[in-house]
Each structure stands twice: as structure tokens, then as C-alpha cells.
Amino acid sequence: IRFLKWEYINFDDCIINIPAEELKNNKPLDVPLANQAIDILKAMQAITGDKEYVFVTSRGKDTPLSENTTTKAIQRLINPVTGKPFGSGYMTSHGFRHTASTMLNELGYHSDIIELQLAHTNKDRIRATYNKAQWMEKRINMMQSWADYLDGLKNQGNVTPINKKVI
């Protein structure tokens, strides 16, 4: 997401179209977005809409945020249990992908749909050769449900803290 370019976002269809050359697996990816994500991106347009990248450095350059910048921002978030910043060792920006995968599996979504949304390649070569399903409607529903679930946690304050470090 740090390298998300405005040209990839299709606001009309609520989707991000990532070209093959931007991904490790060299395959294009269409990423459906929840309404909440679209709202955030529309708000970002007022800030960085004139830049190539959606999330840029604060130095006024058209340079995407560094991984360090996003990780440091996460580390400065306040732990609801201790009332102090999380600090290092608890979460990274990439860790949100792990969390989403785990929680979506726990919520009962099919792992194939989750893996496709995360742009993971099917390691079973025969299955990958024959199965070209994109499950777009299911992914749209999953992402909207995920965003609604997160909103519910945020709005109800019903967040169970996890006291283990992410390894």
C-alpha cells in the first residue's frame, strides 16, 4: 500500500488495479475495496491527489512513505492496556496482513479467497494451472465485512488486547 499510485484506483468500481510489474508474482491484481477504504482514499485525494503516490513523505516530494515511517507510526500508537506507546516488537505495517489473514480465517472466509486478496501465489502448480477463479463478488463482500468488523471494534471499544510480541 505504500507504493499505491493514484492511477491504479478506480473509484467508480471501488477497486485497485495493480499491474503485473508491481507484484512479486508478476500477475496483475484487482483489489476490491470496502466503502470505508474508498472514503479514506477520497479524503487523501485532497492531500496528495496531485502526486503520483497516494501516501507520500511529509517533505513535499513525490516519494512514497518508507517502511520505517509506517512502522514508527504504529509503534507510537497507544496501547489501550498500558496507556503507553506500543514501542518496537509488537507490530509492523506488514503485520496487518498477517492479522487480517488470521482474523478472516477465524471469521470463516475460505482461505483461497483470502490468499487471492493478499496476492499470494498458489503453491500447488497443477491447481494454479487449472483454477483461474477470481471470486470477485466474494472478495468484495469479504472486504466490506472486514471493514465493518473493524469499525465495530473501533466504535464499541470492544478490542481484546494481545499481549504477545509478533515474531
Which role fits each region the language model picked out?
Residues 31, 43-54, 59-62, 68-116, ...:
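Short, basic (Lys/Arg/His-rich) helix/loop patches that form interaction surfaces
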Residues 2, 9-11, 24-26, 34, ...:
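Active-site-proximal structural scaffolding
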Residues 35-39, 43, 47-51, 56-62, ...:
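C-terminal secondary-structure termini that scaffold catalytic or DNA-interacting sites
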Residues 6, 97-98, 162-167:
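A glycine-rich phosphate-binding loop feature that marks nucleotide/adenosyl-phosphate handling sites
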Residues 2-46, 121-122:
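Conserved tyrosine-mediated DNA breakage-rejoining catalytic core shared by Y-recombinases
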